[in-house]
């Protein structure tokens, strides 16, 4: 039951004659620990890092022939269309054209082939990809993790009472609210998950009285800043209530919140001012025009009096197909990274990031607050640290520094002089074997007993 006499309780009275219709949104009762299936990606990106644990040739070959999220998956449709168009033109040229028509076709192909260099694909694609990748990296580093804020709040906002606990939780939640509002406006998946602010409130990330307060603030611009303002005001409240000890602690938390807000501002600004449309249009037109002309210029001309007669009629343009895969794949990489807030498999999963930030942030400032393990002596106390791995599994190479090799050179020189003094001819192989044995079985006082990282 709701206590209407409680001043902290916000009661919204509605007329009895107005039917209240539930919003058409999904059930978020398990949120943030479970994303509804309808918002989960149909296909996830393929993580190939484990496949490249070693640089062996077999591993590289296996990586090249992976399908999911691969170059082949990106270009196979365009390649099939191009091969069909090329084959159709080839059949018409070989069997449907008259002799005079073949001559005109061959001259047209020769004319275009001589001028294919007018389309500087290497320069256009290289410069375009450079801009796109730099933009993508900036967006990636600006997505925002709540970890620093949560750790600073847990460390500096002290108190085990319910009031201090709620202050810590609300600071985290207010930061996540702003992140959710930003992602709602730029990420397709987040927008579908939270189509309205009421959906955000029903999910529990924003409370009903906070939604009312948020809507009461009138502004013609986006109100991403509101919940950050709440979080900073809570810091002042915590300092007034002696939950924060001094200005330094408050300023440290405020600085982390400011960094988080600045990163989200960067993401929002990049969405506001995209790369001019004419540039992606130019690159796409250049690549597709080039390979459209290749349908005619890369035909195998077989007429006896053709100026550019083909020496070997292979029927299938293998080199042009390879060129198509490389250039079209290059273009696909750029277009895949152009808008990382879409629904492609390799785009940013901002739904997961929101869930992760809320779950980890609240756990850090609440469940894990003041949960310090008992301080006991560690197992290395009073002794030197020895290698933790066994001799069988050890693959570390001990680093002694490049100048340490001078001692080894001096040792080899002394051994060589001993052999000469004994009337023996210096044997490089024997000297090398002695050097290896000395390194393996003797420990110099100047050599460390543990590898230096």
From Swiss-Prot:
GO terms for molecular function: chloride channel activity. It comes from Caenorhabditis elegans. The keyword Hydrolase does not apply. This is Bestrophin homolog 5. Keywords: Cell membrane, Chloride, Chloride channel, Ion channel, Ion transport, Membrane, Transmembrane, Transmembrane helix, Transport. PANTHER family: BESTROPHIN, BESTROPHIN HOMOLOG 5. It is found in: Cell membrane. The keyword Transmembrane helix applies. The lineage of its organism: Eukaryota, Metazoa, Ecdysozoa, Nematoda, Chromadorea. GO terms for cellular component: chloride channel complex; plasma membrane. The chain crosses the membrane at residues 78-98, 113-133, 275-295, 314-334. InterPro entries: Bestrophin, Bestrophin-like. Belongs to the anion channel-forming bestrophin (TC 1.A.46) family. Calcium-sensitive chloride channel subfamily. It is a multi-pass membrane protein. Forms oligomers. It holds the Pfam family Bestrophin. Its main location: membrane. Forms chloride channels.
């Amino acid at each position: 039951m709701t206590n209407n006499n409680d001043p902290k309780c916000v009661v919204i009275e509605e007329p009895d004659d107005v039917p209240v219709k539930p919003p058409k949104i999904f059930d978020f009762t398990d949120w943030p620990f479970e994303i509804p299936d309808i918002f989960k990606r149909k296909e996830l990106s393929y993580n190939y890092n484990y496949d490249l644990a070693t640089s062996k040739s077999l591993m590289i070959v296996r990586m090249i022939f992976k399908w999911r999220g691969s170059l082949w998956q990106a270009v196979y449709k365009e390649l099939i269309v191009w091969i069909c168009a090329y084959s159709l033109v080839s059949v018409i040229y070989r069997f449907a054209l008259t002799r005079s028509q073949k001559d005109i076709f061959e001259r047209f192909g020769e004319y275009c082939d001589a001028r294919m260099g007018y389309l500087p694909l290497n320069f256009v694609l290289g410069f375009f990809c450079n801009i796109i990748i730099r933009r993508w990296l900036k967006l990636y580093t600006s997505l925002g993790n709540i970890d620093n804020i949560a750790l600073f709040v847990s460390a500096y906002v002290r108190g085990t009472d319910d009031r201090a606990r709620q202050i810590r939780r609300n600071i985290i939640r207010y930061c996540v609210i702003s992140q959710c509002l930003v992602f709602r406006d730029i990420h397709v998946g987040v927008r579908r998950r939270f189509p309205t602010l009421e959906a955000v409130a029903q999910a529990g990330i924003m409370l009903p009285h906070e939604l009312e307060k948020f809507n009461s603030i009138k502004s013609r611009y986006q109100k991403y800043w509101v919940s950050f303002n709440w979080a900073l005001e809570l810091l002042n409240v915590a300092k007034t209530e002696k939950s924060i000890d001094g200005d330094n602690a408050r300023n440290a938390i405020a600085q982390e919140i400011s960094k988080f807000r600045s990163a989200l501002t960067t993401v929002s600004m990049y969405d506001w001012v995209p790369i001019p449309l004419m540039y992606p249009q130019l690159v796409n037109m250049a690549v597709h025009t080039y390979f459209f002309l290749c349908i005619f210029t890369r035909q195998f001309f077989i007429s006896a009096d053709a100026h550019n007669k083909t020496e070997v009629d292979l029927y299938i343009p293998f080199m042009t197909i390879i060129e198509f895969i490389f250039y079209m794949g290059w273009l696909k990489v750029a277009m895949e990274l152009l808008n990382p807030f879409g629904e492609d498999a390799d785009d940013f999963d901002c739904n997961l990031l929101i869930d992760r930030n809320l779950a980890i942030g609240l756990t850090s400032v609440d469940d894990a607050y003041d949960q310090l393990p008992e301080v006991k002596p560690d197992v290395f106390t009073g002794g030197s640290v020895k290698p933790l791995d066994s001799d069988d599994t050890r693959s570390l190479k001990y680093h002694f520094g490049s100048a340490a090799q001078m001692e080894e050179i001096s040792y080899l020189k002394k051994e060589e002089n001993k052999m000469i003094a004994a009337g023996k001819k210096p044997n490089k192989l024997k000297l090398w074997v002695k050097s290896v044995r000395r390194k393996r079985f003797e420990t110099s006082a100047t050599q460390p007993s543990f590898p230096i990282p």
